């Protein structure tokens, strides 16, 4: 499987136009929104208001985590020929700081994804009523818990 992925036809085109450019646009636009949005949690202490703020924080943390991931699994491989292997990840999570950063990045990424889906459903008119928004909130919270449990279990499989 690894050999196929390494020598896949049009790999650079797919990586550039299907992964990198959309992710770059999302990251740049997200940083712009995070830096220009007004935080009103002091005045309005509603749950969804806190989710809005956490979405921005999780987005910035996720951006840093994805940059670290791209460096470790793509750029470092291309520039130095280092093999992104099980032992490399085991070495990163062997320290409490590495494990903590990985876990925080993982959880922020999952939160940003699930809360972003909730916002997407409202913005695109899929969940317009308060009841449908509440139901989608429960479903996406369950998805967050499932992804977090699966992701943390996978992460701790690397801990020796």
Regions found by a protein language model. Give the residues of each.
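Membrane-embedded alpha-helical bundles that constitute the cytochrome b-like, heme-associated redox core
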Residues: 1-160
């Amino acid at each position: 499987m690894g050999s196929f992925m390494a020598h896949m036809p049009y790999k650079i085109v797919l990586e550039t136009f299907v992964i990198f450019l959309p992710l770059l646009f999302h990251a740049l636009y997200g940083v712009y929104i995070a830096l220009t949005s007004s935080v009103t949690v002091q005045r309005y202490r509603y749950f969804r208001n806190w989710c809005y703020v956490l979405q921005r924080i999780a987005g910035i943390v996720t951006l840093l985590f994805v940059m670290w991931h791209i460096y470790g699994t793509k750029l470092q491989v291309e520039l130095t020929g280092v093999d992104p292997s099980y032992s490399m990840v085991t070495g990163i999570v062997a320290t409490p700081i590495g494990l903590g950063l990985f876990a925080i990045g993982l959880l922020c990424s999952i939160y940003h994804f699930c809360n972003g889906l909730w916002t997407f459903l409202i913005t695109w008119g899929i969940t317009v009523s308060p009841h449908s928004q509440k139901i989608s909130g429960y479903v996406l919270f369950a998805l967050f818990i499932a992804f977090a449990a699966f992701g943390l279990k996978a992460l701790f499989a690397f801990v020796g």
